[in-house]
Amino acid sequence: MKKHALILSLILGLSIIPAGISYSTDADAGKAITEIGILVNAQKYQIAMTKCNAAIQKYPNESFLYYWRGSIHNSMGEKQAAIEDFNKSIELDPANEKAYVLRGICKADLEDKEGALEDYNKAIELAPEDGSAYSMRAMVKLDLGDMDGANSDLDTSNKLMNSK
């Protein structure tokens, strides 16, 4: 599960940067978010963490700064710290489906399968066309013994990912 979670974390991170989306109305904050995302995708976690902490001091209401810091914590195996940052990201932007998916990954890694399932359900509610949440939810359903639900989610995920 952890190997798949790392791969999905990288995919989710990469999906933000190429589109040039910063998710910020402040140009300087947007630039910081983009730079941090690039560092995370390059697996330069310590440098990214330093920049992220500095940016949070300057822009404490930027949801995606907490998202990226949570991603860094997750990549470094610091699941509880990651969950706290994803909680803050969601508090600031309840429509950020990527934060729900990554928080769900952390919860699943900490054996909170029901909490993970709730997060994946919310991510799917927010972005039903995103196959990654279906894939992760399938893994949790499999762990919970719901083979039919897991197969259904994998089918949906494959259809969505193949249609892009």
Role assignments for model-derived ranges:
Residues 2-164:
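Alpha-helical tetratricopeptide repeat
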